[in-house]
Amino acid sequence: MTNDRVESSSGRAARKLRLALMGPAFIAAIGYIDPGNFATNIQAGASFGYKLLWVVVWANLMAMLIQVLSAKLGIATSKNLAEQIRDHYPRPVVWFYWVQAEIIAMATDLAEFIGAAIGFKLILGISLLQGAVLTGIATFLILMLQRRGQKPLEKVIGGLLLFVAAAYIVELIFSQPSLAQLSKGMIIPSLPNSEAVFLAAGVLGATIMPHVIYLHSSLTQHLHGGSRQQRYAATKWDVAIAMTIAGFVNLAMMATAAAAFHFSGHTGIADLDQAYLTLEPLLSHAAATVFGLSLVAAGLSSTVVGTLAGQVVMQGFVRFHIPLWVRRTITMMPSFIVILMGLDPTRILVMSQVLLSFGIALALVPLLIFTSDRTLMGDLVNTQWVKYIGWMIVVLVVALNIWLLVGTALGL
């Protein structure tokens, strides 16, 4: 009886610790449902129905492993990826890493900020510039939570992630996808033509985000409570839950686009405005409004995460610190310039995703090298099969992104 009570007490303590350590992966997972994903998934679903859902499944599994490795680096070494690169690489390499990471963080933020501004424009019927002003104000308010520590911010970002997931449950109810075809699309790989291959590469390229790899290792480096193994076990649960939610959202985006657009003959839907305006007559005003709200929530939360990632990159690589509000003000400027110049926001969004692809390998390669180093990682070092899978992901992602860049440059 006493043993049962002790086991029950230790079980409760383990669950309590696991809950206390939950949160960092929810911040990281937001990077996987940003407006870039909206645009890519909607285009893929409208063009090819359910046939590319399997790409989302595999991209999400790869992203899960990458985020576990990033989180594990922070737990094992109490340093984030940027700090490890600073400590182990020559100074010119470190400066190169810092500059490219800042450029990529700003390019990512451009897509996320404009995505939220488009969302405000669609649901409120205002101009894109007014939407951008609202986005700026909202992100400043969310970032103010950082003054109270990491936990309040984790709760707000986690809440926004759950809101987007709930919004897409509603969208699935409105669009009523075929469950048999949906399941088939998730399980059976299919690439009908060269455009499908290009879109599949785009889905994978938009899924793995370099700035979130840097950020996740910083969110776990100061975790306390329990042993390293217990923190790592709790982190795996954190990643599994958060990334499963993000994966569901991506699947639901593509499935909704397939059910609403592809099978009604609207296969040419390629931007967010079109998607919103077409949803209203096809499904209902409520469905279009829910889409707009989910775009705002995803854009706001991901642009906040992008600002935090930029701060981690600067502090980690060059030990330089600026207040978050200053960084937010600076990184908003490109978005306002794009809007004031009257450039096509969806085209800018796609171009920013292409620029982002340059940074994926630069973040993944050192992450794999460091997490495979026993002197750094101790008992949390990568197993042999994790190394093999990790390098296979690197080769695949790099090859697909090079192919995407070449295709984009040649206008394929």
From Swiss-Prot:
Tell me where it resides: Cell inner membrane
User: What are the protein's UniProt keywords?
Assistant: Cell inner membrane, Cell membrane, Ion transport, Membrane, Symport, Transmembrane, Transmembrane helix, Transport
Q: Spell out the InterPro entries in the cross-references.
A: NRAMP_fam (IPR001046)
Annotated disulfide bonds? none
Main location as per UniProt: membrane
Q: Name one GO molecular function term.
A: metal ion binding
Membrane-crossing segments per the record: 19-39, 46-66, 94-114, 122-142, 156-176, 196-216, 241-261, 290-310, 329-349, 350-370, 389-409
The protein's matches in PANTHER family, at most eight in alphabetical order, are given as: NATURAL RESISTANCE-ASSOCIATED MACROPHAGE PROTEIN 2, SOLUTE CARRIER PROTEIN FAMILY 11 MEMBER
State the name under which the record lists this protein: Divalent metal cation transporter MntH
Native source species: Citrobacter koseri (strain ATCC BAA-895 / CDC 4225-83 / SGSC4696)
